[in-house]
Amino acid sequence: MTFPVAEIRKLFPALHVRDAVFFDNAAGAQAPRVVLDATAEHLLRRNVQRGGVYVQSREVDATIARARQSVATFLNAPDPQEVCFGMNATSFIRLVSQAMGQIMRRRGGRREIIVTDLDHDSNVATWLALRPDGARIVWWRMRKDGRLHAEDLDALLSRRTRLVACTLASNCLGSILDAAEVSRRAHAVGAEVFLDAVHYGPHGPLDVQALGCDYLVSSGYKTFAPHMGFLWGHKHLLDALPTFREDFIPNQAPWKFEVGTYVYENVAGMDAAVGYLESLGMGKTRRSRLVSAMDRIRDYEASLSTALLKALDSIAGVTVYGIADPALVSHRTPTVSFNLEGIPARKVAERLAAANIAVRDGNMYTPRLMKRLNQTAAVRVSLVHYNTVEEIDRFAVSLTGLAGRPAAARRSG
């Protein structure tokens, strides 16, 4: 079945403003009209605090409960009470890491935490900060192919390992991790697994049961919703984590992790975003429709990855980091970082911006990864399912103009 990208693009108002090409989706995706309407509707009709007995407040409670169930279905979580809402994924990573620091201070036990040099720094620095609590950091290094290989964990895991903290997909290179195999190996020695699914979220089906992880964080604004984040974890593990809370807040998930007032209208938007994704799939149940939708998105995005990698390969002076072989696109998302010989990444991004093509430059919050690549910065192009091959062609024309001539022309000349 042909992916209906033309019809999908009509649902995203931002795609039709100033003829813009949004190739910075790893920093935040655009929202469809149904999400914008749900967010605005909440502010217009029920911009009140939850927990009251009057109609609008009860509607807020119902909105949050509905969104919690929607995200649980999106994740294939067995219990919606395992889903916690908050400001962003980074704050949840910090919250869980601080809780584990308290456990190590009070009880000792396992003290080794495995982190990677492929991850966003929010899933690295937070764990490094536990060293004063007695944590010992063990580094899991990516290979030269820009990927983390689960078998490399065998030399790192031991009965001293408390946690493996890793990404499901690299926000810089797009590399996808075999997280189910990571979980299997970690659990074999009694360790837990903390997955950062922020980058992977919009690109394929998420299933916490199949992944086998113990905790997972992701972000709504990378998945076509407004700015918000969510944490999932096994209920018994979340309930056991010490957290700061006022005495009147239940010491149970999700409430113990939702201290203070978060942005309810954005949670309403997240609920609508799950509904939008569901509308792209087929099936008799909500979960089956979501899996169908995310499978369709993954397959369509594979064609975008292939076109993008081929376009970059045709331009002289371009170095692509990580998986560059179009035959291996099943191992990556359509997120590609590259540099253009002799031209700083910022200059490339500025020239593309002048052509109304939005990309990202810098270290992508992965400074250790950049060091491994012997770079201080790169240009990142990150696509999602509303992007098109025609946009890739437009990008390639602009980049070729900046580079001078296509690679084929330089070789033949």
Predicted regions and their residues:
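Pyridoxal 5′-phosphate
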Residues: 1-413
